[in-house]
Amino acid sequence: MKKILFLLGCMSLLSFIITPKVYAGEAFSLPDNSVVYDIDQGGSQQFEVEDDLGRPYIITIEEETQLLMMASSVKNGTYKITKERPLQWKASYKIDVSSNKITRAHSASATAITGSFKSTSLRVDSPTQATYYLKRTLLLVESSINLRAKLSNGNIVVTY
């Protein structure tokens, strides 16, 4: 009985060691501090992440519902990008996507529960990238927050 348990243990250990692992990053490389929204899956996708200092954030990407859906491309539409530091602040904006290009960034919003936002700026940096730049002040300390959405390989890559 001990031999059988030993063999089963060895076999399961080997299966973990030799099993090939496929990572999403193999298809394309991701920048640090990024999450990937699968446009084909659609809907609302939420990610609980931490920055380099271990501070928690919630990143949410939502597909806006449209009354007239165009049959030509499921990738066309409006997507809301949100970054939130729970109990401290929340920032969001929307991007319009058409023919795998960001045609417009709009509806920027920033709410501070603690501290305040000194400045905010929403820009379409290129046909495939939009960034929301924010400067936040808390107890005389200023910090920069960037929330970038980039179209890549049929996905929206959000860098926080």
Residue ranges with predicted function:
Residues 1-84:
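N-terminal prepro-regions of secreted/extracellular proteins
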Residues 64-160:
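Mature secreted bioactive peptide module from preproproteins
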